[in-house]
Curated annotation (Swiss-Prot):
<dbReference type="InterPro" id="IPR011961">
    <property type="entry name" value="RimM"/>
</dbReference>
<dbReference type="InterPro" id="IPR036976">
    <property type="entry name" value="RimM_N_sf"/>
</dbReference>
<keyword id="KW-0963">Cytoplasm</keyword>
<dbReference type="InterPro" id="IPR027275">
    <property type="entry name" value="PRC-brl_dom"/>
</dbReference>
<dbReference type="GO" id="GO:0006364">
    <property type="term" value="P:rRNA processing"/>
</dbReference>
<protein>
    <recommendedName>
        <fullName>Ribosome maturation factor RimM</fullName>
    </recommendedName>
</protein>
<dbReference type="InterPro" id="IPR002676">
    <property type="entry name" value="RimM_N"/>
</dbReference>
<comment type="function">
    <text>An accessory protein needed during the final step in the assembly of 30S ribosomal subunit, possibly for assembly of the head region. Essential for efficient processing of 16S rRNA. May be needed both before and after RbfA during the maturation of 16S rRNA. It has affinity for free ribosomal 30S subunits but not for 70S ribosomes.</text>
</comment>
<dbReference type="InterPro" id="IPR009000">
    <property type="entry name" value="Transl_B-barrel_sf"/>
</dbReference>
<dbReference type="Pfam" id="PF01782">
    <property type="entry name" value="RimM"/>
</dbReference>
<comment type="subunit">
    <text>Binds ribosomal protein uS19.</text>
</comment>
<keyword id="KW-0143">Chaperone</keyword>
<keyword id="KW-0698">rRNA processing</keyword>
<feature type="domain" description="PRC barrel">
    <location>
        <begin position="97"/>
        <end position="170"/>
    </location>
</feature>
<dbReference type="GO" id="GO:0042274">
    <property type="term" value="P:ribosomal small subunit biogenesis"/>
</dbReference>
<dbReference type="Pfam" id="PF05239">
    <property type="entry name" value="PRC"/>
</dbReference>
<comment type="similarity">
    <text>Belongs to the RimM family.</text>
</comment>
Length: 171
């Protein structure tokens, strides 16, 4: 079964030439919305995803504006309002070493370099300079771990395990 990933939501139309206004959910809009790429529009539940080919992409304020092959006026794209844009897992690009997709990290077990199990990563926050991983502990409050080289020693996405160095004051 194909695993799908949300890259944006069509929130409105823009102009009369078939452009749609998208709130992007991807860290790679230039790659995802590149002219010629295929995206899949997910409308109402129970309907098959509709493949569409991107014919133009530009940014406007906080939105990405897209047009699709075969849809050249506002009346043809009006029905897409509220739909999600997704890509299948095989369309996800390779990342550089030490970079991971959120879905690869969320659900990983976190252990110290001494083998002590701390919990499971449930969420990733992006407050500024670096991401912060939220660790759900079996007992007690959630633990916040900054994703920096001094703390995160190893990430094994195949085994769903992250090994960290516990600095003084971290726990």
């Amino acid at each position: 079964m194909t695993k799908w990933f949300n890259v944006g939501k069509i929130v409105n139309t823009h102009g009369v030439r078939g452009e749609v206004r998208v709130i992007s959910r991807t860290d790679f809009p230039e790659e995802r919305y590149k002219v010629g790429n295929t995206l899949y529009i997910w409308g109402e539940k129970g309907t098959e995803p509709l493949p569409v080919k991107v014919t133009s992409h530009r940014q406007h304020k906080t939105f990405d504006l897209l047009t699709f092959e075969g849809y050249s006026n506002v009346n043809e794209v009006e029905k897409f309002k509220g739909s999600l844009l997704k890509v299948p897992e095989e369309q996800l690009g390779e990342l550089a070493e030490g970079e991971y997709y959120y879905h690869e990290v969320i659900g990983c077990k976190v252990v110290t370099e001494n083998g002590e199990e701390l919990g499971t990563i449930t969420e990733i926050l992006s407050p500024g300079a670096n991401d912060v991983w939220v660790i759900k502990r079996p007992k007690g409050q959630d633990l916040l771990i900054p994703y920096i080289d001094d703390i995160v020693l190893q990430v094994n996405v195949e085994q769903k395990q992250v090994t960290i160095h516990v600095m003084e004051g971290l726990l």
